[in-house]
Amino acid sequence: PLDSPDYMNAFKAAKAQGAFIFWNHPGWDAQQPEETKWWDVHTQLYDGGYMQGIEVANGSSYFPEAQQWCLDKKLTMIGNSDIHQPIQTDIDFSKGEHRTMTLVFAKERSTEGIREALNNRRTAVFVTRAISPPRERKRES
């Protein structure tokens, strides 16, 4: 079903295999310059149970709209570096720089423990010396 003209078949196959599916690059400039937008396809994926998380930070890019969607829709926050070459070409560790990463608050050190934490949204995103909140915040009115 992965070699199919209907992209939903890939999501159905991934879900059937128990995959943890998350949306990468919600604020990708090449796709939607200067805004982070929730498209109809994302509603379809979310409503169908095909999306468990969203990447709220990628490299030095942070997508506050994506973080709010995670809070509103009870999705897991993910952060990635998206580095496609040796890390030291982008990160200067001697200056205290670090890659963007997902902190997973697992109850045990195992694959199952990590998956359980992801499923229950026990993550935080470490990006540019800040950590996104791992739990809901009250919005200011």
Give, region by region, the residue ranges found by the protein language model.
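Extended substrate/RNA-proximal surfaces in nucleic-acid metabolism proteins
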Residues: 1-50
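Charged catalytic cores and adjacent phosphate/nucleic-acid-binding surfaces used
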Residues: 31-141
